[in-house]
């Protein structure tokens, strides 16, 4: 429950200044008295160009409307399967390394109480949340906005393909590790 003040670690590949609702959710949690830190990537959505003022190859720490934001190295989003996978896995790897570091702690120097994973594409963005859960034994709440690997079908991948089967395995592993999954559609519950 969020009645008591919590220290919340948010894992999401995209965050302000990128146009995603998770920014509003985090700012509302701060307004309600919770401590919130976001672990995100370099802003580059949707064009695949890192936004002006954000350095390539550097971790950037800032506070946006009361939310502490840590930006992890991310290869910008590009078209093409290989480039898209590099984008997905660069964030997954760098965010996981960060959450396991001594630097990823709440303002009191202790672990966060809960991890909130705002899951858009790709599902692998949840790897950092799982790593934090495993290290500190805290729960993960996932807000699932993009169902994997089903979202790959919209991109022309067939269910019989090796790519689909691989990401089906990855997705099942990730979804099983969540303590709670919030969904945007009742149809998601049939899959999850």
What is each model feature region?
Residues 168, 172-192:
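A short, active-site helix/loop in glycosyltransferases that binds the activated sugar's phosphate group
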Residues 113-114, 180:
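Structural motif
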Residues 1-63, 180:
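N-terminal subdomain of nucleotide-sugar transferases
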Residues 124, 136-141, 149-173:
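Nucleotide-sugar donor phosphate/pyrophosphate-binding loop at the beta->alpha transition
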Residues 40-102, 106:
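A conserved catalytic-core segment of Leloir-type glycosyltransferases
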Residues 32, 132-136, 177:
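Helix C-cap/helix->beta junction micro-motif
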Residues 19, 85-100, 114-145, 150:
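An aromatic- and histidine-rich active-site surface loop
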Residues 44, 122, 187-189:
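Alpha-helix capping/helix-boundary segments
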